[in-house]
Structure formats: structure tokens, C-alpha cells
Amino acid sequence: MSQMLHIEIPNFGNTVLGCLNEQRLLGLYCDVSIVVKGQAFKAHRAVLAASSLYFRDLFSGNSKSAFELPGTVPPACFQQILSFCYTGKLTMAASEQLVVMYTAGFLQIQHIVERGTDLMFKVSSPHCDSQTAMIEDASSEPQSPCNQLQPATAAYVTSPSVPIPLLTRVKHEAMEMPPASGPGLASKRPLETGPRDGVAVATGAAGTPGTAPLKLPRVSYYGVPSLATLIPSIQQVPYPPGERTSPGASSLPTTDSPTSYHNEEDEEDDEAYDTMVEEQYGQMYIKATGNYAVQEKPEPVPLESRSCVLIRRDLVALPASLISQIGYRCHPKLYSEGDPGEKLELVAGSGVYITRGQLMNCHLCAGVKHKVLLRRLLATFFDRNTLANSCGTGIRSSTSDPSRKPLDSRVLNAVKLYCQNFAPSFKESEMNVIAADMCTNARRVRKRWLPKIKSMLPEGVEMYRSVMGASAASLPLDPEFPSAAPQVFEQRIYAERRSDAATIVALRTDAVNVDLSTSANPAFEANEEVDGGGSVIQEVAAPEQLPADGQSSPQAFEQGNTSSSRPQTPVATATRRPEGTYAGTL
């Protein structure tokens, strides 16, 4: 038997990729160009297809040599990601984290998406390492090394390796809060001032001499304690410490949809969240908000009357159990606490903003279902009337009805991109079908309910005015009626059988000649026989009080000549009131 020879070159794949990267930088042997906002990047199809599912689908069955990416992709960000595909290394500034993460999610580069959490936490800082937490001021400005805290205060320590629920489980043992210049704070693990400037280090030893321990009240997932509310001299530390500001977070443009807040019951306990499923999260979060309506916060309950205290209850974050189901595919800001009214840019660079509370509502209601998430986002940005007047696409008007204009393409594309980042397998064709279906449902609801609203209004009234938000307090009447006199119209239609719809419509449309002269009170009578086998009683009341059920009507009824085998139809009589009050059939 011949002897087998085995040759193995260490890191041969990395060497080949390095050579391909050099060829790319020199523009040699590149077979595709990726155009981003007019800037072309040469690359190799095989390398891009091996790194990105997006490019794999794009190149499949397409032999073009140039492809253009959407305008939401920044060229500088794509250049960094392209270099990552060849080298496996990614270097970026702290302010570019969100942009890179969203671009990588759009391009479906799983290596960057899966390591997104580590990428957000591993940010080099002169004030932060594995044992310390960085201190930031309220304005999110980088702090100078010379800035020091007061020696009698200590910061609240948050570590990326410790989940949010563990950080919030602090027992309530003391009701009285010390003054601002009082002793330091200590939780389950005492805090002491470390050797660094103004940095609190969590140790197992006792606190510094002269510091009295103080246990913070117990809080839920939606309220991580902020010492800035208790002791004004202590600066607030957001979680996670790596990310300071998101692109566009400083500008707060208005949106069409109102802000939604979450008001949790004071007696709710942390353990209740552990056993909830995703549907219960959605019901719990929106049970008091209505349909994305602004709701005033209730009055705070005194500390003496409750055993559990929520500190900064307006700060919200995704529950830990929901994060364990969906992972880190949501907006990065949702994993840290923040004001529900804070404006978040849905996709970096898109200019489309949504409040934290609204976005959390969408995720809590959708859970792991990406199609439900798309519907919730569309319902947040577009009201039902806008959807009913639209065709569901952001490209062109409807071919069947040109009056149906497309939805705002900027908002629609941002929503699609966000949902695609949440579920990379979510195809755009499926999103278009869902958007068109929502528009169709909105038109169907409007078509079904507006005739019912019209039937309850007096004839001659524009029914669309009340639907579009106009006040229905003063309704315009027919100009032939005197406007100075108070006019009361009350009508009751009773049908023995529900199948007599034609009879009811005929009675509604029957014209009645009313004598409005100042002569004596004339009475006119109308007699009508219904051919449907059922009788219809039409009763018209004047401003006087209506008779109780069981009493005979004061109106004069004349009985028509009908056969004994068929019920007789009494007909209402309308009279002219001397004070100008009109009563008659409509």
C-alpha cells in the first residue's frame, strides 16, 4: 500500500482572503461594482456572496456587473462592512455603531448581526473597563478626566455582564432618603470609591468608614432606579454604558402619531414578568393606553401606603423574557431604560422617528411574529383614514382608482427596512401584500360603518363631516325650515319582521308636505298599506315628554281599510305647532 502524504498550510484561507483584499484595493480581477449614492466599490462576487445572504440572492441568476444599493446605506459604512467581508475585522467609532448594525442587518451579514451585542458593549473608554462603569452627565457629553465627583457620593454601578433584571432587584429596607450631602449608597454589594477619579467599584468588602448603607426601593423591569432623582449631586449613568447618543437623536421632529405611555400598577411584582408569554406582554402594556392615546400619569401613591416603590417609573425597557425570545434584533435603544416619549430614529439615516413607547408597544404586541410587527408599525405611522385613501404602495397610484395615492415612501421604506432587520427572511413582496391588505381593510371598515352613521343622522346632513372629525354638535338643517325656532326631530321605526327593509327605506324616502303657515293647526293624514305581510308603525313625537311604554300615543291614528286576514297599518300624523315646533316624518 502506497504511503499518503499530507500537506497543510496554516491560515491558508486567511492568506487567500488577504490576497483578494489587496486585489480589491488595487482594482484587479474584480467582477462586480456596488454603487452606493453614486460611489462605486469594486469587489468579488464570490466573497460578497459568501459573507452576505443579501448579495447571494442579488447575484443569483443576474449577470450584471454593477448593482446599486438603496439610498439609506451610507457609503462610509458600506466601505467598513466591505472590508470586514475580506478581513473579518471591523473598526468603527462609537457614534457609528447603530449605523453599522442596521446596515449589516439590511445586507444580512450574520457574523456582524450575531455579535451585535458584544459590539455595543466593547467600546474602549478611558473611564471604563471590565471592573468599572463609566460616568456620564445628563447632556451625554464625553467627560473630561479632570472631572471628579464629590467624595461623599458614589455612582450606581451597571455592568454589561449583569442583566437588567438583576440590577433592578434591590430590596426596600429604608423609607427615609438622606440629604444630598449625606452618606454614600450601598446595595446588596456595597459600593466604595475606587482608585479612579469618581468611579465606583463594586467590591465584597464593607464600604468606606463613615458611610451609612442605604438600600434602594424595589423596582420592576420598567423602572431602573436613577440616583439623580434621589440625590441631585449624583450624575446619572445610562445602561449600557457604551452607547451615548444615536444618530439623529438630538433632533426631534414631530410625527403624525401620538405618544403612548405605559402606566404599571404599583403593586406589580418582578416575578409576574417571568411567567408571562408574549401576548400577555402586549395586553399588559397597552391595557390603559387605548389606541396609542396619550394618557395622563396617575397621582403617585404615598410611600407609607405601599410595600413596593417604583423609582423613575417613566423609564421603560424591553422585558428580559421577551429579549430571550427575540434576541437583539430590535432597536438598540430599547434594551436600555429611557423615557417613553423619547424620539428614536427608526432606521439610522432615514429621518423617520418614532417614540420609544410606540416602538415598545409594537414589539410587545408582536413578540416573535414579524408580520404582526409590520402591521403594528404601519398602524402607528398611518391612521385608518390615511390607509383607506391610499393604495398600500410607496411607488405609484392605484391603477383601478387614481385618487388613491401611495403611502409616504420615506416612512414605508423605513418600516420595511426595520422589519427586514428584525426578520432577514421577510421578503419585500410579502410586506407589500400586507400593506395593501391593511388599506383594503380600512376601506372596507369605512364602507361598512358610514352608511350606518348616515342612517342615524337627519337627512341633508353631510355624513362625512362627523367622520372626518368635525363637530356634530350643530348640524345644518334644510334651509326651508325656520332657524330661529327650536326644532326637535325624533323618529322611531318599528318593524315586526327584519325582512321589511324595503318598507323602512320607502318610509324614510317618502316626502311629506308640511304646512308652515300661521293659520290654525291643520292635521294631515297618510294611509299606507304594506305588501310584505308585516306592519310598520312610524311614530313622531313633539318636544313634549314621550309617553311611557304601554300607554297609547297621543297622536291621532286613522285605521285603513284592510282585510281581516292581514294586520292593519296605523300611520303617524304630523301637526304644525303654534310655537314653531315641527313634528313630522323624515
Curated annotation (Swiss-Prot):
Region entry Disordered, spans: 177-196, 236-272, 542-586
Sequence ranges of Polar residues compositional bias: 247-261, 550-572
GO cellular component: chromatin; mitochondrion; nucleolus; nucleus
Residue span(s) of domain BTB: 30-94
Coiled coil: none
Positions of crosslink type Glycyl lysine isopeptide (Lys-Gly) (interchain with G-Cter in SUMO2): K171, K215, K297, K427, K454
Cleaved signal peptide residues: none
Pfam family, one: BTB
PANTHER family in the record: AGAP004733-PA, NUCLEUS ACCUMBENS-ASSOCIATED PROTEIN 2
Subunit relationships: Homooligomer; mediated by the BTB domain. Interacts with the NuRD complex. Interacts (via C-terminal part) with HDAC2. Interacts (via BTB domain) with MTA1, MTA2 and MTA3.
Name recorded for this polypeptide: Nucleus accumbens-associated protein 2
Lineage of source species: Eukaryota, Metazoa, Chordata, Craniata, Vertebrata
Encoding gene (name): Nacc2
